[in-house]
């Protein structure tokens, strides 16, 4: 399989937010969507370079319950980005 990266992203969406599922289905290029329950799904794909998916994956921040990838670089980069965003924009107890 030419060293494909396997990626899985579990996404939760609230009541009335089915548009998230529709968006995921519409925008995915490869892979499949598994429905886990009424408000949770998993996107699964095997791609040549999962790091190229990071900008798209980031658009689901706040809804991602779990992210796994055979390329640990992708997972580490995603969570490091979250830590950087929290350091820049959040975490202050006196924030407005």
Where are the regions that the model predicts?
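Polybasic (Lys/Arg-rich)
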Residues: 1-96
């Amino acid at each position: 399989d030419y060293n494909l990266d396997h990626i899985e992203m579990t996404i939760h969406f609230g009541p009335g937010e089915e548009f998230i599922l529709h968006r995921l289905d519409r925008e995915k290029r490869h892979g499949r969507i598994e429905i886990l329950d009424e408000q949770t799904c998993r996107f699964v794909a095997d791609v040549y370079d999962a790091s190229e998916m990071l900008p798209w994956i980031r658009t689901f921040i706040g809804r991602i319950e779990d992210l796994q990838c055979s390329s640990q670089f992708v997972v580490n980069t995603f969570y490091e980005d979250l830590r950087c965003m929290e350091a820049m924009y959040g975490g202050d107890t006196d924030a407005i």
